[in-house]
Regions:
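Short, ordered beta-strand-loop transition motifs
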Residues: 25-33, 54, 99-104
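Short solvent-exposed beta->alpha transition segments
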Residues: 1-31, 111-123, 127
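OB-fold (S1/OB) nucleic-acid-binding surfaces
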Residues: 101-143
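Short nucleic-acid-contacting surface segments enriched for D/E, G, S/T with interspersed K/R
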Residues: 80-87, 129-170
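Short beta-strand edge/turn micro-motifs at domain boundaries
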Residues: 37, 42-101, 116-123, 168-201
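Hydrophobic transmembrane alpha-helix bundles
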Residues: 21-24, 36-40
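Short linear motifs at secondary-structure transitions and domain/linker junctions
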Residues: 10-14, 23-27, 62-68, 83-87, ...
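Sterically constrained small-residue positions within well-ordered secondary structures
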Residues: 27-29, 41, 81, 160
Length: 202
């Protein structure tokens, strides 16, 4: 499966590091990991994730399992191109107007091609029944995020917009667009809280 990785602007590589900004150790699915946020002099902060290699015990920069990846271009997926289901790393923002309805409404925003300082142009909505297990779980995750208690991503979300929750989702797209040419989307599964995880979508 082709993986599209978020890339960094060329000028970032020419900018000098100003030093570590935040650092934290955590476990992802039982595997020791480290999150590092580094500030640069003339460019945006950069995120790094390291894992502890079980074979030699060394800490290594992880480019695959933990990096943001997607099976296809987010913009193409939202516009109806390619496979109709895929795993994505997104920010999820709750629509406050939906709190008085039967379903929660969430807007999904993917990182742009220049990393987390960029935002995707396409920002579809998904709807989740409040009384469903997923609806209850998302309610608790947003509540935890607001209270900043036991957040599963304490470091790398330092520069995120307030109220934007990082999640890994399995998303499906309708076969045909509506009269306006827009596709509808269904949140098939909430794969992870935060953007890092070893499990592949099944």
């Amino acid at each position: 499966m082709v993986k599209h990785y978020a890339v960094t602007k060329p000028e970032v590589m020419l900018s000098r590091p100003a030093g570590p900004k935040k650092f934290a150790l955590l476990e992802v699915e039982g595997h020791p990991c480290a999150q590092l946020l580094i500030a640069f002099t003339d460019s945006p902060d950069m995120e790094f994730c390291f894992f502890k290699d079980e074979k030699d015990g060394l800490w290594k920069l992880d480019w695959q399992q933990f990096a943001r990846y997607q099976p296809q271009s987010w913009e193409d997926f939202v516009r109806g191109k390619g496979e109709g289901i895929g795993e994505f790393r997104v920010w999820m923002i709750r629509d406050r107007m939906s709190e008085s309805r039967d379903d929660y409404a969430y807007r999904l925003i993917a990182p742009g091609m220049n990393g987390t300082n960029d935002r995707s142009i396409a920002r579809p909505m998904v709807y989740v029944p409040k009384k469903s297990d997923m609806g209850k779980r998302l309610f608790m995750l947003f509540k935890m995020d607001e209270e900043m208690l036991h957040s599963p991503y304490k470091v790398l979300n330092a520069n995120d917009d307030r109220g934007a929750l990082r999640v890994r989702v399995l998303l499906s797209r309708s076969k045909e667009p509506n009269r306006k040419g827009e596709y509808s989307f269904t949140l098939v599964k909430l794969l992870g809280e935060g953007w890092y995880g070893l499990s592949a979508a099944k």
